[in-house]
Amino acid sequence: LSAHHFQTFEGIYSRSEYALEAKYMFGYSLYKQSPVYSLDQTPSYEAISVLQDFINEYPQSAFANDATSIINELQLKIELKEFEAAKLYAKVRQYEAASVTLENFIRDFPGSDLQEEAFFLRIKMAHDYARASIQSVQSDRFMLCVGRYIAFLDKYPNSKFLVEAEE
């Protein structure tokens, strides 16, 4: 409800001395509506959009640093949701879905702290998928696993997951 009122105020009184604060508070209100990572993140995307617009419009504002911190927090929540979705697919043995979700995660969140684990899980998913496959396609799927292992080794030669990946 507060988000609506701040949005309305900012729209109607855009020349007011409080318009800047109203725009920030609109984004902040959306941020407060953002649920835990396991739920739909539509409010998080909306908050990121509004707060990014705020930063673009008022980069020198006293609220700009807070807005940046909130955006970073919301992005971490979205990253975690995507990563946990991939792990859930793996847990229920939906290996192809887990692989696709991990590929999307790697592409969409290149600077994530979870990248290394995502690369490792790609190997694990390829391996588990190959083992669960019929014999006629197993060799191709194990080759995919080897390819992913090599890519992992190139990117993370000193990984904490290296011992497990070699198995």
In which residue ranges do the predicted regions lie?
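Acidic, polar-rich low-complexity tracts and alpha-helical solenoid repeat scaffolds
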Residues: 1-167
